[in-house]
Amino acid sequence: MANITAALVKELREKTGAGVMDAKKALVEVEGDMGKAIELLREKGMAKAAKKADRVAAEGLTGVYVDGNVAAIVEVNAETDFVAKNAQFVDLVNETAKVIAEGKPANNEEALALKTAAGDTLEAAYVNATATIGEKISFRRFALVEKADKQVFGAYQHNGGKIGVITVLEGENTDEALAKQLAMHVAAMNPSVLSYKELSEEFIHDELAQMNHKIEQDNESRAMVDKPALPLLKYGSKGQLTDEVVAQAEEDIKAELKAEGKPEKIWDKIIPGKMARFFLDNTKVDQQYTLLSQVYIMDDSKTVEAYMESVNGKVISFVRFEVGEGIEKAANDFENEVAATMAAALNK
């Protein structure tokens, strides 16, 4: 029988990340052959990963890495928030972002086939992490963002990496600091798209209906305390404000000023403010979902678009990942697991 020394166990642990007892058992089983022990642990790790494959992993972290004119953002999931703070998990997330930024894969399959600094594939790294950490660790998604030489990246991670953002700006007065500030805005305000031009007519119609339903509910409450009803929204996006609609709004304002007896010589001073209010009141969908139409959190006197124009800058693109978005968390996973274990025991 081979002599399994502490130094041998330590070496195997350093190479595989296995626990002390797992490393020792593997060495004993293969009579101290390091190569066979590594292979054995990998096989056992794959078996452990397979057993955990159907679990829901909805916690985790985002990772962001910038490499010249290419930036990568990734989401990696674990089953619990506790594991998401594990140093091995954090290192895996960061390495995943770096490997993807440098390798530029087209999809998840290509990403998982990329090699890590240790020489293994990313897929093998995830199998190993699942085995050694003891939870299902899964690579969920990534996005690659490219920029031109004269453009700048902004990278920001919020709440310890629960939200990750990459922005791209261009303009003589834009820099990484401004791009990062905009990334902070994106993290906080969660826009869905850059411009109102990206919203479909159906989406605007549905959102407007929901907003008006909320106004109707509020009006019922206002009526109970003798407050005047709020008007329903007719429009929700700049895309609906055609030249004819805008011209009619201006005519309505002029008619209102005339009815109020305001002298025509001061109309030019009043109309711009009222038209600005008209646009504000009739672009509520844009303000909620489009970055350029949102009020900029660093200067609440301007929209993002207006602020960027004031510094001769332009937003080219952005990507925002939030951990777990779109994943349905099963609250009774643990209960189901216990029940399944008990059922299996009774059927033996």
From Swiss-Prot:
Record's function text: Associates with the EF-Tu.GDP complex and induces the exchange of GDP to GTP. It remains bound to the aminoacyl-tRNA.EF-Tu.GTP complex up to the GTP hydrolysis stage on the ribosome.
Gene Ontology CC terms, in alphabetical order: cytoplasm
Gene3D superfamilies on file: 1.10.286.20, DNA helicase RuvA subunit, C-terminal domain, Elongation factor Ts, dimerisation domain
Major place of residence: cytoplasm
Protein's name according to its UniProt entry: Elongation factor Ts
UniProt GO MF annotations: translation elongation factor activity
UniProt keywords, alphabetically: Cytoplasm, Elongation factor, Protein biosynthesis
Gene name tied to this protein: tsf
Subcellular location(s) of the protein: Cytoplasm
